[in-house]
Amino acid sequence: MITKTSETFQFDAIDDVVSDIAKGRIVIVTDDADRENEGDLVMAAEKVTPEAVNFMATHGRGLICVPISNERAEQLGLQRMVAQNREAQRTDFTVSVDAARGVTTGISAYDRATTILAIANSKSSPEDLTQPGHVFPLRAKEGGVLRRAGHTEAAVDLARMADLQPAGVLCEILHDDGTMARLPELMEFRRKHSLRICTIQSLIAYRRQREKLVTLEQVVKLPTDYGDFDLHLYRSLLDGMHHLALVKGKIDQDKPALVRVHSECLTGDVFASQRCDCGNQLHAALRQISEEGNGVLVYMRQEGRGIGLAAKIHAYKLQEEGLDTVEANAKLGLPADLRDYGLGAQILFDLGVRRFRFLTNNPKKVVGLEGYGLEMVEQVPIRVEANPHNKKYLETKKKKLGHLL
């Protein structure tokens, strides 16, 4: 199966890519244009052969590395290459290694394959490797691509999903002249060598839709100005962050619940800032849910549309100098909106919500909740009054972010 992600480029379905990984085949994994915008050859480490290493060295031309889990790195006694990682993408290199036995110089395709197999072997110990060497292990973040959207994590995730050891092999794809191959060239490379290709973004979406990423820790009663709610405390299994859900009444899977997914805004929600409409939307949603007698407000800890409190305050300063909210984020090197609604969707599902009426002015939230076993039956707008301080902000949300105001 092939999925079409743009008018020009077609990518393979993750299930098909995982199937090839399980069979010991090489695939291409690409990342986002906002990141490295590169493609890597990727395969499972325990399936590596001298021929595969030679293919990567000959046709990929990049550095051949072996992404592994942190647990595996500790088992093998692999220390980080540097104490302070200043590499742009924070790729977590360990010291380089060779196999302790069965190799000569360590650089041949045969020798490197032998070393990679030793790294992937669950029975290997630190004594089975020598340092330094000609193979470069990389430590993947716990949580894989759901924690860090990198090729390192993608390689380990794909191996795990194929029921293999959490270790991969990767190599960047370069042009003949040594420059990085970009997406058009990667598609031609894929056709020439009959390889499957996927994006890290599609792998993230695949995992988010299939894995439970939140756990319920506590439920308490919460009396408010808008009536009594049940306050549910959830913890993300990815980063330990806590999120909240205020539930009114009893959730009935057959009756669409009134739902609001609200991202934290300290300045608006707590200090009643007039620079935004967040606090007004929060209270309007609580009022509407209370009047309905049945519904959920999910409170996500995604301050500043996901960029964090400090970055938001810096963006405020740029707005005072004349930039709008989107331009200010861009000036800081940040996307206009970094929020992820996948965890919110999983919280709703865990609460028993299946069909819902969605309190939102943001179409992106609708898209963000799709694919999690939830069905939106109605989009309900939240109407709040503008003021002289947030008028430009609201106009920018409407024109540049597509909000329905």
Stretches with model-predicted labels:
Residues 1-405:
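Catalytic domains of riboflavin
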